[in-house]
Amino acid sequence: MEHHLLHLVGLGEVDGVPYGGAQAVNLKSIVWYQPAEFEKRGYAVPETWDEMIALADQIVAEGMTPFCFGMYSNGATGWLATDWMEDIMLRTGNGVDSYDAWVNHEIPFNDPIVKTAATYLSQIMHTDGYVVGGTDAIVSTFFGNAQDPMFERDSNGNPGCFMHRQASFIPGFWPEEAKAGLGTETTFFAFPQMDVVSDTVLGAGDMWAVLVNDEATQAVVDFMLSDQYWTGVAENWSGTSSTRITAHTGFDTSKYWSPVVAQQAEFLKAALQANVFRFDGSDNMPTEVGSGSFWVEMTELATQGPGYIDTALDNIEKSWP
């Protein structure tokens, strides 16, 4: 475990006793796009929120749609909006300090800082023309298919959308022909800077836990954390083109089969080593909130519009155990 940061090890602790930790991590603070489509139209990759909004307005004015956005996920509908909220919270208010306070309920869910974040999110969800299919399509579009319009072309040769904020695992849901273009046709840029300039990275991951402490279990854990296991994943021995990234900060990122995955792995590795990685906030909240009221109220917000922000945040605050 010497190459697994204390932050990740701590996620598997109860009362200071380690029962597990993170095996794989994914990068969430990214926006997928197609460089050729940007270059063809003279679009610059946005580095700030205001630049992204200006670009979105330009795309709408030119008769196209800037964002893919779909959050339907069966019984888990709503988590995609919570990811947006988390990235925004890291870059507004007091940055990582208010993010940590929010996750730990040291500030209420209806705090003005949280309302500001929800207002930014609503700007994306509810501005006319910003999302594929309009606002009504957000909650009915399966998150795994949400980016598909980016890979399609209309009669004028324009893609269905130009930007999609989603984690590094999403290529696993792409159509097969789109997967072949990972890193060439489709790549990513960092989630734009906002009110608080920050290099903090949002992520999540696959966790492991030991429930039976015997030699066989230990052998499995040792193997799944080993260089041998991750070399197989990174070099695509299975032929599945996995985008999984190890939580092992000593792993040689040049082994990843795709330059894009290697770049994401290096991005995560640097964030972990610099202690600027933050695990998905809703995953660290009480179940009643993180996978309960937060999901439900973000779904309602998408449906109801910006006038529902106060009600959504008040309802989540009331649900905190």
Language-model segment annotations:
Residues 1-29, 53, 59, 80, ...:
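Hinge/lid segment of periplasmic solute-binding proteins
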Residues 29-33, 208-210:
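Short glycine- and hydrophobic/aromatic-rich loop-to-beta-strand nucleating segment
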Residues 1-6, 11-13, 36-47, 149, ...:
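Extracytoplasmic "Venus flytrap"/periplasmic binding protein-like
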Residues 41, 169, 176-243:
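Extracytoplasmic/periplasmic substrate-recognition and gating elements
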Residues 1-4, 71, 91-116, 177-181, ...:
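Short, solvent-exposed loop/beta-turn-alpha elements that line the ligand-binding surface or hinge
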Residues 37-38, 54-62, 142-164, 300-304:
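Short helices/loops that flank or line small-molecule/ion binding pockets
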Residues 259-321:
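C-terminal capping/gating helix-and-loop segments adjacent to ligand/active sites or protein-protein/ligand interfaces
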Residues 71-73, 94-177:
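Extracytoplasmic ligand-binding clamshell segments of periplasmic binding protein
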